[in-house]
């Protein structure tokens, strides 16, 4: 299983949100390029970078910074505000390894399909963020500010028909809380769609959580807040 460090960007700084809330932001003193270089030296094979300003505004704001981070030598999957073919092509042409498409996949499936066809499915990661109400994982959009009526399973089934294989799934209730991932959700995801390369994000506390996710068949795990709090030796995980 691939371990992917995450870097969230806001106004050019490394930050973390609690449960996706923009009114609960923790800023970190380390600069994004320094953070990317740190992960590169530890042996990370990939970074997950989110432009929170872009996610909120609907247009990526920090592409130049993200490209500078990728010059450290780590392939980057990046998202936050990619909501047009022009923006997707700009990111792809700038050298971003994989584009992370979130809200657009829910609000504008036709445009999302055009982007998939233009960029190629293997270069796309769908980021599907859910709130689990009455045991049904419903998708949130626009930087988690709004809820949709679409379920995770409906959307995955739809995009699977267009060649999508990489899906990043976050249970918002777990994100930034350090209380453990939603293992039931990921177990269902792998059982329902075993051919999808699932990436798990949110709530990972320690090595046992990663071991459990691996045993469920998850392809990759995104690590965020815990890496700033030294809860885990990342170098050991990456070896």
From Swiss-Prot:
Gene3D superfamilies, sorted: Aldolase class I
Gene Ontology BP term (one): L-tryptophan biosynthetic process
Active site, renumbered: 8, 129
InterPro entries membership: Aldolase_TIM, His_biosynth, HisA_bact_arch, Isoase_HisA-like, Isoase_HisA-like_bact, RibuloseP-bd_barrel
Cytoplasm in keyword set: yes
Any Pfam family: His_biosynth
Gene Ontology CC entries for this record: cytoplasm
Gene Ontology MF: a single term: 1-(5-phosphoribosyl)-5-[(5-phosphoribosylamino)methylideneamino]imidazole-4-carboxamide isomerase activity
Record has Isomerase as a keyword: yes
The protein's annotated pathway: Amino-acid biosynthesis; L-histidine biosynthesis; L-histidine from 5-phospho-alpha-D-ribose 1-diphosphate: step 4/9
EC class of the enzyme, as a word: isomerase
Places the protein is found: Cytoplasm
Keywords associated with the record: Amino-acid biosynthesis, Cytoplasm, Histidine biosynthesis, Isomerase
Enzymatic reactions: 1-(5-phospho-beta-D-ribosyl)-5-[(5-phospho-beta-D-ribosylamino)methylideneamino]imidazole-4-carboxamide = 5-[(5-phospho-1-deoxy-D-ribulos-1-ylimino)methylamino]-1-(5-phospho-beta-D-ribosyl)imidazole-4-carboxamide
EC number of this enzyme: 5.3.1.16
PANTHER family linked to this entry: 1-(5-PHOSPHORIBOSYL)-5-[(5-PHOSPHORIBOSYLAMINO)METHYLIDENEAMINO] IMIDAZOLE-4-CARBOXAMIDE ISOMERASE
NCBIfam families: 1-(5-phosphoribosyl)-5-[(5-phosphoribosylamino)methylideneamino]imidazole-4-carboxamide isomerase
Family statement: Belongs to the HisA/HisF family.
HAMAP family: HisA
Name of the molecule in the record: 1-(5-phosphoribosyl)-5-[(5-phosphoribosylamino)methylideneamino] imidazole-4-carboxamide isomerase
Gene designation: hisA
């Amino acid at each position: 299983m691939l371990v992917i460090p995450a870097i969230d960007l806001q106004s050019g700084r490394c930050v973390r949100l609690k449960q996706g809330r923009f009114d609960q932001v923790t800023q970190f003193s380390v600069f994004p390029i320094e953070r990317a270089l740190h992960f590169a030296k530890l042996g990370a094979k990939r970074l997950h970078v989110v432009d929170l300003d872009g996610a909120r505004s609907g247009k990526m704001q920090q592409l130049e910074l993200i490209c500078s981070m990728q010059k450290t030598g780590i392939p980057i999957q990046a998202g936050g505000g990619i909501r047009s073919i022009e923006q997707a092509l700009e990111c792809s042409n700038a050298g971003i390894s994989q584009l992370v498409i979130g809200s657009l996949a829910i609000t504008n499936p036709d445009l999302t399909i055009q982007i998939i066809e233009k960029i190629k499915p293997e270069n796309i990661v769908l980021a599907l963020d859910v709130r689990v109400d009455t045991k049904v994982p419903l998708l949130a959009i626009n930087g988690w500010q709004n809820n949709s009526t679409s379920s995770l399973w409906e959307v995955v089934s739809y995009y699977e028909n267009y060649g999508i294989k990489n899906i990043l799934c976050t249970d918002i209730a777990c994100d930034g809380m350090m209380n453990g991932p939603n293992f039931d959700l990921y177990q269902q995801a792998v059982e329902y769609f075993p051919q999808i390369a699932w990436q798990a994000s949110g709530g990972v506390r320690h090595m046992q959580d990663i071991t459990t996710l691996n045993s469920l068949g998850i392809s990759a795990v995104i690590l965020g807040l815990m890496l700033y709090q030294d809860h885990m030796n990342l170098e050991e995980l990456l070896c």
